[in-house]
Amino acid sequence: MAYRMEGLPERVTVYEVGPRDGLQNESAIVPVEVKAEFIDRLADAGHTVVEATSFVHPKWVPQLADAAELLGRLDRRPGVRYPVLVPNERGLDRALELGVTEIAIFASATETFAAKNLNRTLESQFDMFEPVVARALEHGLDVRAYVSMCFGDPWEGPTPIEQVVAVGERLLGLGCYQLSLGDTIGVGTPGHVTALIGAFGGPDRLAVHFHDTYGQALGNTLAALKAGVTTVDASTGGIGGCPYAESATGNLATEDLVWMLRGLGIETGLDLDKLVSTSTWLAERLGRPSSSRVVQALAKG
């Protein structure tokens, strides 16, 4: 039974990041055939966007060193997008060679994380992004931008809202079609979410990406929906974190998100039973239980 709440959208796009943001943080290398089946299962469950992999140098993210082989194995379905993360122009070159049609770039809202993750300053990171976005747009690619540490980081504490907006507006100004606001270490709370989204002056080109470190991901998501956001990033079984932020724990679990949205009468186009089955299947291959509360509860009957 669904119970609507006033002021929420009729439909939400769940942007699945498990194959990229989830698997990049695994200690063991997941075989490429498992990754390909994982992505195919997600598409079969109704996902219209599945972030497939990353072209970050294998030295930094060895778990995704098989990006080219994986893309070659994908059974691409009509109506499903398979974006990839691209860190720089070399990564873009590889993506273009493989016929990718959508990419994502990854920015920082704080100086310290920009230095640790990108080896750049807050300002100089744009020297890297500008040619990537410009060339991608010239080739007809869609470009999405992630901004990490939007609510706080382990070194600088709370991130000033105006600092996040300044970074985000510049990325949108480059031509990115969407900005995903990331709570990389999970310190955000619903009021903070409302304030940040409101500071952008409109939610139309915003998405949210919450980690559940302090158990706030679903509450933060509800606040974002009330503020007008209609795209939410999530990861199968809550897998993932950030290789460069030790205090970052798992992503918002796709199954938990869909359970809440279904209860609110919000359409997603997703089959929860298939999502749970996929989460259980993946957990068996990763050698540990799914961290999704919904998957755990349904497993107990």
Regions picked out by a protein language model, each given a short descriptive name:
Residues 1-301:
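Catalytic cores and adjacent flexible loops of soluble metabolic enzymes
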